Amino acid sequence: MVKLIIGSNATGKSFYIKNNDEFLQYVKMDIHDYQIRAHEEYNASEFISFQEKFKILYEANEKIKNDIVEAVKAGKDVVVEHTLFKMKRRLPIIEAIRAVSDTPIEIYLMQPSDEQLLKNCQMKDKENRHLFESIKNQMKEIEIPSASEGFSKTFFIKDGLVLEYTSEVDKDVLDKARKELFEEQ
């Protein structure tokens, strides 16, 4: 079983994973940890170009994808904390897992209420008044996951309440995401 817990910063991904006993026996992976390691391996300074930043993020995504696949091949259950706003970022992970296993892949999209998001933002940075609006804008950019991407089940999590939903993505949108991925390589 692979469970992807996705969403913007400060939406409660880490809290959900840490406070869910189901994940005690799961291998836990957090994209933030992979990004930090990739940044360190690249010896990147604070001021890097967009191309360098993209390369670091790409490397982190490749490493977490490979680690997910290795854990699945070893028969382990995995929970992954990630942003994965775009379908084109989710597809390589799904396809890599499917290449080695038919294990269920579930995705959980964090969608806190404004009240909960404001509390989360205040816990992260009491001084930054723009954090809340910035994250609200990020949340609008998320492409809602669907079963047609290859997920066994799709869920929203709103203030701790887990709600299963079904939606189908337009085949043209799926094809566009695959084309964008191909063009990036």
Annotate each PLM feature.
Residues V100-E106, S148-K153:
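Short glycine-/polar-rich loops that comprise or flank the Walker A/P-loop
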Residues A44-I48, R98, M123-E127:
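Short, hinge-like loop/turn segments at secondary-structure boundaries
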Residues Q25-D30, E106-L109, T154-F156:
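Conserved beta-strand scaffold positions in the cores of enzyme catalytic domains, especially
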Residues F50-Y58, T83, N128, F132:
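Flexible, glycine- and charge-enriched loops at secondary-structure boundaries
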Residues M1-K3, G75-K76:
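Pre-Walker A (Motif I) flank of P-loop NTPase domains
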Residues K55-P104:
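Glycine-rich phosphate-binding loop used to anchor ATP phosphates in small-molecule kinases
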Residues V2-I6, T11-F15, N19, F23, ...:
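Conserved GTP-binding G-domain of TRAFAC-class P-loop NTPases and closely related GTPase folds
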